[in-house]
From Swiss-Prot:
It comes from Rattus norvegicus. It catalyses: an organic molecule + reduced [NADPH--hemoprotein reductase] + O2 = an alcohol + oxidized [NADPH--hemoprotein reductase] + H2O + H(+). PROSITE patterns: CYTOCHROME_P450. The gene is Cyp2b12. It is an enzyme of class 1 (oxidoreductase). GO terms for cellular component: cytoplasm; endoplasmic reticulum membrane; intracellular membrane-bounded organelle. It is a peripheral membrane protein. Keywords: Endoplasmic reticulum, Heme, Iron, Membrane, Metal-binding, Microsome, Monooxygenase, Oxidoreductase, Phosphoprotein. This is Cytochrome P450 2B12. Its cofactor is heme. Its EC number is 1.14.14.1. Pfam families: p450. The modification Phosphoserine is found at S129. The keyword Transferase does not apply. It is found in: Endoplasmic reticulum membrane; Microsome membrane.
Amino acid sequence: MEFGVLLLLTLTVGFLLFLVSQSQPKTHGHLPPGPRPLPFLGNLLQMNRRGFLNSFMQLQEKYGDVFTVHLGPRPVVILCGTDTIREALVDQAEAFSGRGTVAVLHPVVQGYGVIFATGERWKTLRRFSLVTMKEFGMGKRSVDERIKEEAQCLVEELKKYKGAPLNPTFLFQSIAANTICSIVFGERFDYKDHQFLHLLDLVYKTSVLMGSLSSQVFELYSGFLKYFPGAHKQIFKNLQEMLNYIGHIVEKHRATLDPSAPRDFIDTYLLRMEKEKSNHHTEFNHQNLVISVLSLFFAGTETTSTTLRCTFLIMLKYPHVAEKVQKEIDQVIGSHRLPTPDDRTKMPYTDAVIHEIQRFADLTPIGLPHRVTKDTVFRGYLLPKNTEVYPILSSALHDPRYFEQPDTFNPEHFLDANGALKKSEAFLPFSTGKRICLGEGIARNELFIFFTAILQNFTLASPVAPEDIDLTPINIGVGKIPSPYQINFLSR
């Protein structure tokens, strides 16, 4: 549905809903300043067509690092800048640990699952997930071994192209998805498996739909737009199809479960369900399982694969950086074994390049919404319990107080005078605090192993000259993706 039609519909019903809103109890508290909202419309007129991020960054210039916007009738507090975000999510971690609502996902997730739960449900599921994914199955293959296996499969697949140009999107989706599938489902899929290809297609299409203008408008007025056509309808359909597939996988696991030898995340969860079946208040139920698996699969596939697409586009733009990384690979790893996470500490330049790619690419500029769990005083303002909070991670990744050239790709941002890796408090691609990305450790190891394995085995080439490569991303709502490109992987 086009923006103009949505706006007209909003204005048409706005008066009636405004009358309803006047009968509702007012929010107590003293929220940060912000643009004056219109009845029901909120700050719709301050939101430009380029999306929430551009609108918020413009408002930051006027109102500072902490301000309030009204997304439709509901107030949302916006946090900008490294210090502001860390002060909230780290220094007052418990108060800001609630999960806000993502309107286009809520009809499916409904507060279930490790990513979208809040309160004790979230704490219970997060503890379980962290332990299960870190110590996965006593005596079983480690997560890193699974990543290395996928890296080897990728290298063999790329060799089949014999240096011919290709769009790497599908292969990068496949290796990221297979890593999480191996952990959660206990198996990896062939790159030509039809069901696997269909799942990847659903993930990609759903991500694009979530970034559409229609979805952003839905975020403001979901209460009545849910009754009309729009991207949210297809998102719901896609997610339900993925849930049905996951439910089928869960039933297969249940039928073949061996309590003495859990194979994966699902097996481990089913064993915990059985252990707590007499506890009527347990959070280990079917709904939390399937939504957790859906969340892990979706997040683990799209974010890592998009980062890899950005990574190699940037390497094509700056071939001297790729050459320097290859030199470090040759010195530390050589050519006769796959990289391991342990190699990273001996490869500061490569590590700095990966850090800078994540910072510069800035793929998730607006973190998932938070919600304060109690009345909270923050920088002199009173945020009532359940106030939603948006941390603008992009404002940290491009914070001029921490990065000398925030809008320029420069690995030196993460190297000290001695060439050692330099940490930065502004490096927040995974967010921070209690809600930091559950799969941060896995994602970091994936990026390192996949990146170094490819450059260990291949020299990169492009049909386009480096000076003509455009790194300007495509903005999809609250996220970014690189423009499609072709790349040649030439065997070294």
